Amino acid sequence: MDPRSEVILRQQDYLKGRVLLINAPNDALVSQLPTEIDASVWTWNYADYQGFVNTGTPAHFSVEFPSQEFDQAIIFVPKSKELLNYILHVVMSHLKTDQSVFLVGEKKGGVERAAKQLQNFGTILKLDSARHCQLWHLKIEKIEKIKPLESWLKTYTVQVNGQELTICALPGVFSQTHLDVGTAVLLPYLNQVKSGRIADFGCGAGIISCYLAKANSSNIIHALDIDAFALQSTEMTFSRNGIGSDQLRLQPVTGIADAPTELDAIVSNPPFHQGIHTNYDASEGLCQNAKKHLKASGELWIVANRFLNYPILIEKHFGQCEIKTDLQGFKVLYACA
């Protein structure tokens, strides 16, 4: 069990009524809470959501707060400070004064910094410190008036092969305020990508998807991501750039296995973070299994840190892998099915 969940169980006597677990890990916590606790989960991680659904735990996959009413909320601290600001805002706009909010997180995950954000809304108290985690309690004294989701957007412009794109990114989305180096290295090669049905695996704020859609109005883009905030950001990026929704297929995925088949191309700056931890499972799975989702002569385009062994993985499954460039610590890799 996740150590943060263990800390919650140690202090379960504080819980009562309808309790919303926000950003909770997919473990046995809910099943081990007392039966009188009516617990449900709000998550934006599709893999976690599927896990909760499979175990019969009431779960809500969205960027928005659930529509039900709750007596308490437990926030598992996210990696992003901006995302925590958003979560705190929506919690304080849905709960009432004198209700309880709990904040739990790992010390190395910034729980003490998060507690300082929490104290903007009332008196806080540290309830526990164990398993390299802390649990804080807030009695709500100040509630918020809900702000529209669009007010949380960060936008910036990107020049790609003579086109200017406006990128929209919600809190917690990779490279929310600027173009990351890996994608910048990949962008000049996007005009070589085969047209047709194209998947952007780990679409983030939709930079790759948006360029490919704008470059050819006949392209159909399957924007794939595990994160609801990324999918919502991609949809907003398309709208901001005047690209019709008929070119966009948004799809939450747990990995490449959930992707459509018979694709003309898969393009990716693959994800490698899960919360505060590094996890290469999704990107390694992409290298190993992308061919199953491509048509004959379909293309795989990946940008990745040069120290990763992806060329070997791709060559093993495609029979070849071409390194298009090696620049600023990143390689652009190409293979044809």
Swiss-Prot record:
Subcellular localization: Cytoplasm
Main location: cytoplasm
One GO molecular-function entry: 16S rRNA (guanine(1207)-N(2))-methyltransferase activity
Entry's EC annotation: 2.1.1.172
A GO term from the CC aspect: cytoplasm
Catalytic activity: guanosine(1207) in 16S rRNA + S-adenosyl-L-methionine = N(2)-methylguanosine(1207) in 16S rRNA + S-adenosyl-L-homocysteine + H(+)
Pfam families found in the cross-reference section: MTS, MTS_N
InterPro entries for this protein: DNA_methylase_N6_adenine_CS, Mtase_sm_N, rRNA_ssu_MeTfrase_C, RsmC/RlmG, SAM-dependent_MTases_sf, Small_mtfrase_dom
Superkingdom of origin: Bacteria
Protein keywords: Cytoplasm, Methyltransferase, rRNA processing, S-adenosyl-L-methionine, Transferase
Subunit structure: Monomer.
Family membership: Belongs to the methyltransferase superfamily. RsmC family.
Purpose: Specifically methylates the guanine in position 1207 of 16S rRNA in the 30S particle.
HAMAP family assigned: 16SrRNA_methyltr_C (MF_01862)
Protein name per UniProt: Ribosomal RNA small subunit methyltransferase C
Organism: Acinetobacter baumannii (strain AYE)
Organism taxonomic ancestry: Bacteria, Pseudomonadati, Pseudomonadota, Gammaproteobacteria, Moraxellales
